[in-house]
Swiss-Prot record:
It holds the Pfam family NAD_Gly3P_dh_C. NADPH binds at S11, W12, H32, R33, K106, A141, R256, V280, E282. GO terms for molecular function: glycerol-3-phosphate dehydrogenase [NAD(P)+] activity; NAD binding. The active site is at K192 (proton acceptor). Coiled coil: none annotated. The gene is gpsA. Signal peptide: none annotated. This is Glycerol-3-phosphate dehydrogenase [NAD(P)+].
Length: 338
């Protein structure tokens, strides 16, 4: 039995905490909202994020980050990308021993263009970090809590650390593979949210299955181009954390990014969409980072670029789609390389 703390009591943090508790681990969830911690402890529910779910009675919560830090041998970071530095700052003062960190956030920090593992390595004291492992893949929280079969990947340059995380989470409903390609896994997990926003827009415009199939395929091509240029393994992008996560995020009603894109395609403005969603839509922030990364690495990312225009330059979605369709003629395989 491992002592594990999950930082973040949103839908994904709560679902993973449920997996860990059901696997017999001593699991504590940290939330910055005291009333949410009390609800989890007293009612064994998290109505805002998982309204139909009863949480295990051996899963506990706290709003005291000092208690969270001292409890854990392994810490799972399940907070939005924009909150990671702030949470790490609070956590750093309370860490008393070396800890294995697992992050499950999918994003890239705009401007700094750092991946999550880089932000963690920069924000946490090195002497208190055992290893940093990323856990990613096609995994909607709403299905995990129903024990629907789910398969993900644990990635770390230190494969022993990845295998430890594999052992922590794996059970008959939740299968975990390992990978040593942290860059590829993180880039695939982050950028699929960008393509999912675009997929939602095509559905909002009622453009049908042909358009969405093309968008997913061409989206994978540009994710792969960038990921390989940044040092990722090209084979990673055809795996669970690339194509797998892209499919589920572009096609499922559980996907926040798809839902947000769908509203944009129906004519809503970005701020209206974000206000109505009431939850973090990582793809919006990541689109800005993707646009910056494309410029930095000199990689063609036409879908991400047009989406950036829709989100931040008030270009109409239909105009952006027309621009993609009328790009210069290309050979498909050559275009996937460059």
């Amino acid at each position: 039995m491992e002592k594990v703390c999950v930082l973040g009591a949103g839908s994904w943090g709560s679902a993973l905490a449920m997996v860990l508790a059901e696997n017999g681990h001593d699991t504590l969830v940290w939330t910055h909202r005291a009333e949410q911690a009390e609800e989890i402890n007293r009612m064994h529910t998290n109505k805002k994020y998982l309204p139909e779910t009863v949480l295990p009675t051996n899963l506990h919560a706290t709003s005291d980050i000092a208690k969270a830090a001292t409890h854990a041998e392994t810490i799972v970071v399940a907070v939005p990308t924009k909150a990671i530095r702030e949470v790490c700052e609070k956590l750093t003062a309370e860490l008393t021993k070396k800890v294995l960190f697992v992050h499950v956030s999918k994003g890239i920090e705009p401007d700094s263009l750092k991946r999550i593992s880089e932000i963690l390595a920069e924000s946490l004291p090195a002497e208190k970090v055992d290893e940093i492992v990323v856990l990613s893949g096609p995994s909607h929280a709403e299905e995990v809590v129903l024990h629907h079969p789910t398969t993900v990947t644990a990635a770390c340059a230190d494969i022993d650390a990845a295998e430890k995380v594999q052992d922590l989470f794996m059970n008959q409903f939740f299968r975990v593979y390992t990978n040593d390609d942290v860059i590829g896994v993180e880039i695939g997990g982050a950028l699929k949210n960008v393509i999912a926003l675009a997929a939602g827009i095509t559905d909002g415009l009622n453009y049908g299955d042909n358009a969405k199939a093309a968008l997913i395929t061409r989206g994978l091509a540009e994710i792969t181009r960038l990921g390989v240029k940044m040092g990722g393994n090209p084979f990673t992008f055809s795996g669970l954390t690339g194509m797998g996560d892209l499919i589920v995020t572009c096609t499922s009603v559980h996907s926040r990014n798809w839902r947000a894109g769908n509203m944009l395609g129906q004519g809503m403005k970005l701020q209206e969409v974000l206000d109505q969603m009431g939850m973090v839509v990582e793809g919006v922030r990541t689109t800005k980072a993707a646009y910056q990364l494309a410029e930095k690495y000199g990689v063609a990312m036409p879908i991400s670029t047009e989406l950036y225009s829709v989100l931040f330059n008030d270009v109409e979605p239909k105009v952006a789609v027309d621009a993609l369709m009328m790009r210069m003629k290309k050979r498909e395989i050559d275009e996937m390389k460059h």
